[in-house]
Amino acid sequence: MTKETQSFEEMMQELERIVQKLDNETVSLEESLDLYQRGMKLSAACDTTLKNAEKKVNDLIKEEAEDVKNDESTDE
């Protein structure tokens, strides 16, 4: 699977693997920098995914509240 099509869960798993590798004292400086850079990109992608999900949830809550309000006003 390409990195562009990774699910949120797959990105989080990759981030966990990166952290484990960075904790390993035998990782070279060059590899550490590459891992850090990839981790930062994954972190940003996860943050965007979470913000989009939060917006969708908030939109759904607003829609539901409006539906309930409209239902209550038609009942009167």
Swiss-Prot record:
Tell me which NCBIfam families the record gives.
PRK00977.1-4, PRK14068.1, xseB
Please indicate if the UniProt record lists Protein transport as a keyword.
no
Question: Which keywords label this protein?
Answer: Cytoplasm, Exonuclease, Hydrolase, Nuclease
Its biological purpose: Bidirectionally degrades single-stranded DNA into large acid-insoluble oligonucleotides, which are then degraded further into small acid-soluble oligonucleotides.
One GO-annotated biological process of the protein: DNA catabolic process
Name assigned to this protein: Exodeoxyribonuclease 7 small subunit
Pfam families registered for this protein in UniProt: Exonuc_VII_S (PF02609)
Family recorded in the similarity comment: Belongs to the XseB family.
What are the leading ranks of the lineage? Bacteria, Bacillati, Bacillota, Bacilli, Bacillales
GO cellular component, alphabetical, reads: cytosol; exodeoxyribonuclease VII complex
Q: Name one GO molecular function term.
A: exodeoxyribonuclease VII activity
Instruction: Write down the chemical reaction(s) this protein catalyses.
Output: Exonucleolytic cleavage in either 5'- to 3'- or 3'- to 5'-direction to yield nucleoside 5'-phosphates
Q: What class of enzyme is it?
A: hydrolase
EC number, as in UniProt: 3.1.11.6
The record's subcellular location field reads: Cytoplasm
**Assembly mode:** Heterooligomer composed of large and small subunits.
